[in-house]
From Swiss-Prot:
This is Cobalamin biosynthesis protein CobD. One of its GO terms (cellular component) is plasma membrane. Converts cobyric acid to cobinamide by the addition of aminopropanol on the F carboxylic group. Pfam families: CobD_Cbib. Its main location: membrane. The gene is cobD. It is a multi-pass membrane protein. It is found in: Cell membrane. GO terms for molecular function: ABC-type vitamin B12 transporter activity; threonine-phosphate decarboxylase activity. Pathway: Cofactor biosynthesis; adenosylcobalamin biosynthesis. Belongs to the CobD/CbiB family. The keyword Lyase does not apply. Keywords: Cell membrane, Cobalamin biosynthesis, Membrane, Transmembrane, Transmembrane helix. One of its GO terms (biological process) is cobalamin biosynthetic process.
Length: 319
């Protein structure tokens, strides 16, 4: 029934998204991270000690997430297999963020269409780490497309990949890794030491899913009649034109498929960061690139689901 749970969860995410007031494991993981982080900071003060404490933070959060997820599924299956199946569907559903990502991007798109620049800057600031206060409409559009491209990996492709390898508990552990990076994996003075291990482990966890996104997004470009050849070419050529070892794969591929440039200089935490460009500017970026990038992400997500389900079926059967 495991593969059926995958497809049911995927459909649920496509239908419901992430209702803001529903219980969500990522919020619980976030509270655990905050709790353990405070304990680490009370005990560790030097940079070296904070790095060691940060490693402990990572082990505790990821280990507990896997253990609780596995234990919950075991207990629910012991009560009744159908109860276990329903809980598994719920777990997987909470791991997927395709609909949430799509809705958020379309909200910014809608506000931009109305010409409400200040409001679009504010909405964008909720989903990106850069300074949005001075961005114009093309820069906001570029930031949204980059966000959709980047988060197609950690929001859908990577959770499905770890689901294939180790089921819902391992996929939930991946989500803990991703949440740790989001909360403490910064290069700022405050987080550089305590978040060092979390940032490196997130890079490691996303290494293969990011590279698979190059193929999946290129295939998606072919399905929706975008330039899949340029997606493959630019995705490979510009894969390392990013400060992250992983984000360039998906962003460069989307840039190639759409025929636009992504990346470039940005402001983070009050500092200007010079980032290289990805893609060839065969045309200027347009507002329509936001729904196009969402369409790419959705098709790539469906292809990932089918690919990983097939591999799971071939390797271990339906269980």
């Amino acid at each position: 029934m495991t593969l059926a749970a995958w497809f049911a969860a995927f459909l649920l995410d496509s239908w419901l998204g992430d209702p803001p007031h529903w219980p969500h494991p990522v919020r619980w993981i976030g509270k655990l991270i905050s709790l353990v982080q405070r304990a680490v900071r009370r005990c560790c003060h030097s940079e070296r000690a904070l790095k060691v404490g940060g490693a402990g933070l990572w082990i505790v959060v990821v280990g507990l997430t896997w253990l609780v997820s596995w234990g919950c599924l075991w207990l629910m299956n012991a009560i009744h297999p159908w109860v276990g199946w329903l809980v598994e569907v719920w777990m997987i559903y909470t791991l997927l963020a395709g609909r949430c990502l799509s809705d958020t991007a379309l909200e910014v798109h809608g506000v931009l269409q109305q010409g409400l620049l200040d409001e679009s800057r504010q909405q964008l600031s909720w989903i990106v780490g850069r300074d949005t206060s001075q961005l114009d409409a093309p820069q906001i559009t570029r930031a949204v497309v980059e966000t959709v491209a980047e988060n197609s990996v950690d929001g859908v492709i990577a959770p499905l990949f770890f689901l294939m390898i180790g089921g819902a508990p391992l996929a939930m552990a991946y989500k803990a890794i991703n949440t740790l990076d989001s909360m403490v994996g910064y290069k700022t003075q405050e987080y550089h030491a305590i978040g060092y291990v979390s940032a490196r482990m997130d890079d490691l966890a996303n290494w293969l899913p990011a590279r698979l996104s190059w193929l999946l997004l290129s295939a998606a470009a072919w399905f929706i009649r975008l330039d899949f050849r340029q997606a493959l070419r630019i995705g490979w050529r510009d894969r390392y034109q990013h400060t992250s070892p992983n984000c360039g794969w998906s962003e460069a591929t989307v840039a190639g498929a759409l025929g636009i440039r992504l990346g470039g200089p940005s402001c983070y935490f009050g500092e200007r960061v010079e980032k290289p460009w990805m893609g060839d500017e065969r045309r200027k970026i347009a507002l329509t690139d936001i729904p196009l990038s969402i369409y790419l992400m959705m098709i790539a997500s469906q292809l990932a689901l089918l690919l990983f389900a097939l591999l799971r079926l071939l390797l271990v059967g339906m269980a």
